[in-house]
């Protein structure tokens, strides 16, 4: 119950109330804001000097040496060794040559916090062994897979499917035993380098360059595996809807708000395929701005129906964490469940559908309802 209003009997008090003035407004703010220190930066990785790539890589094969630098630095050096010309591309993209040290080193009165030299006085100039090269291949294969899929979680978890890609590559290079024995860097997981590269503004251009360059062997065999992973990577909505339209046998397809978006989806994807040709499957991996045209928000009802169907039919989607009903959708899960009880016909005569819905269904091979 709200408190009772107190009656004011005192005439002076009533007069004071009439004379009440609101407090003055706050003074205007000057518009200044906390500034970053001029010339300051967070600890960052580096790639050293181009002439030192091989010697730096040899040194960084040793864990104790890797531990001296920013955790991403060794991975970037291994990539520069793997792909000649990448060092210059990284420099063009703004990657520093100097790497921060994990712990500053004091020499006399000077404290060193970063350096572009990653090898020590005891590091010898030598060629890498085949097993060392294969170990660098393994590390970089996992790293680049994480970059094209836009996530480090599978690599951090050591997913078996990632290991299979490397084993397939080693078999193609006639070194099948290295699929099991190239383990010199197995304790150095590249997940931090994946996250760092995925956060750079040039990541899409980097992936595009990898996918469109004709590499000599063993680069060709290496990139064949990366391309297989990159194809339709980060395009889950598109691939799920395509599978739904091709394989669904229930009447959720005929819900009007879903059906009308099928037509839109087919038109948009056809236009994107025409515009991008062979690059269409890689729009997600190269972070092309057109990839957003295939996002759930473009077809919220169709995407909701497709995810609902896929979670019921596809075991690999059962653990998909995204919400079934997408933002902006008007279709409800109860409605999808009700329509799912009825089957459609593909290639056989079935019950008639309304004119406009029927025309849309014919686009995907649906001939009626059972």
Swiss-Prot record:
GO terms for cellular component: helical viral capsid; host cell; host cell cytoplasm; host cell nucleus; viral nucleocapsid. GO terms for biological process: symbiont entry into host cell; symbiont-mediated arrest of host cell cycle during G2/M transition; symbiont-mediated suppression of host NF-kappaB cascade; viral penetration into host nucleus. A motif (Nuclear export signal) lies at residues 128-141. Signal peptide: none annotated. InterPro entries: P40_nucleoprot_BD-vir (IPR009441), P40_nucleoprot_sf_BD-vir (IPR036260), P40_nucleoprot_sub1_BD-vir (IPR015969), P40_nucleoprot_sub2_BD-vir (IPR015970). SUPFAM superfamilies: P40 nucleoprotein (SSF101399). Its main location: virion. Pfam families: BDV_P40. The keyword Nucleotide-binding does not apply. It is found in: Virion; Host nucleus; Host cytoplasm. Residues 1-25 are annotated as: Disordered. Residues 10-19 have a biased composition (Acidic residues). A motif (Nuclear localization signal) lies at residues 3-11. Keywords: Capsid protein, Helical capsid protein, Host cytoplasm, Host G2/M cell cycle arrest by virus, Host nucleus, Host-virus interaction, Inhibition of host NF-kappa-B by virus, Modulation of host cell cycle by virus, Viral nucleoprotein, Viral penetration into host nucleus, Virion, Virus entry into host cell. Encapsidates the genome, protecting it from nucleases. The encapsidated genomic RNA is termed the NC and serves as template for transcription and replication. Plays a critical role in the nucleocytoplasmic transport of viral RNP by interaction with other viral proteins. The nuclear export signal is masked by the interaction with the phosphoprotein P. Delays the host cell cycle progression by interacting with the host CDK1-cyclin B1 phase in late G2. Inhibits host NF-kappaB activation. Homomultimerizes to form the nucleocapsid. Binds to viral genomic RNA. Interacts with phosphoprotein P. Interacts with host CDK1; this interaction delays host cell cycle in late G2. Interacts with host NFKB1. Isoform P38 does not have the nuclear localization signal, nonetheless it is localized in the nucleus. This is Nucleoprotein. The lineage of its organism: Viruses, Riboviria, Orthornavirae, Negarnaviricota, Haploviricotina. The gene is N.
């Amino acid at each position: 119950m709200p408190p009772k209003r107190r009656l004011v009997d005192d005439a002076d008090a009533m007069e004071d109330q009439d004379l009440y003035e609101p407090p003055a407004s706050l003074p205007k703010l000057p518009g200044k804001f906390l500034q970053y220190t001029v010339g300051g930066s967070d600890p960052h990785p580096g790639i050293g000097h181009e002439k030192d790539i091989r010697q730096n890589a040899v040194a960084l094969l040793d864990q104790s040496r890797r531990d001296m630098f920013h955790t991403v630095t060794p991975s970037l050096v291994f990539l520069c060794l793997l792909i000649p010309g990448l060092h210059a591309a990284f420099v063009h993209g703004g990657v520093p040559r100097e790497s921060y040290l994990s712990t500053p080193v004091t020499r006399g009165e000077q404290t060193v916090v970063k350096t572009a030299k990653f090898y020590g006085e005891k590091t010898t100039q030598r060629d890498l062994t085949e097993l060392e090269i294969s170990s660098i291949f393994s590390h970089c294969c996992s790293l680049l897979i994480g970059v094209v899929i836009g996530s480090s979680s599978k690599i951090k978890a050591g997913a078996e499917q990632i290991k299979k890609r490397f084993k397939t590559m080693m078999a193609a290079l006639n070194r099948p035993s290295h699929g099991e024995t190239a383990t010199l860097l197995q304790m150095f997981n590249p997940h931090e380098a994946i996250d760092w590269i995925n956060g750079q503004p040039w990541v899409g251009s980097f992936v595009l360059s990898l996918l469109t360059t004709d590499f000599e062997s063993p680069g060709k065999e290496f990139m064949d595996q990366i391309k297989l992973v990159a194809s339709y990577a980060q395009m889950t909505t598109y691939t799920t809807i395509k599978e739904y339209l091709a394989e669904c046998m229930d009447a959720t397809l005929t819900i009007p708000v879903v059906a009308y978006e099928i037509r839109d989806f087919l038109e948009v994807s056809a236009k994107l395929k025409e515009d991008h040709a062979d690059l269409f499957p890689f729009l997600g991996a190269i972070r092309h701005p057109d990839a957003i045209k295939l996002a759930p928000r473009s077809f919220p009802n169709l995407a909701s129906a497709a995810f609902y169907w896929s979670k019921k039919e596809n075991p690999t989607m059962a653990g998909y964490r995204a919400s079934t009903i997408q933002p902006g959708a008007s279709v409800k899960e109860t409605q999808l469940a009700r329509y799912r009880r009825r089957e459609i016909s593909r290639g056989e005569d079935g019950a008639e559908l309304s004119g406009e819905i029927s025309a849309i269904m014919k686009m995907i091979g649906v001939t009626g309802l059972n």
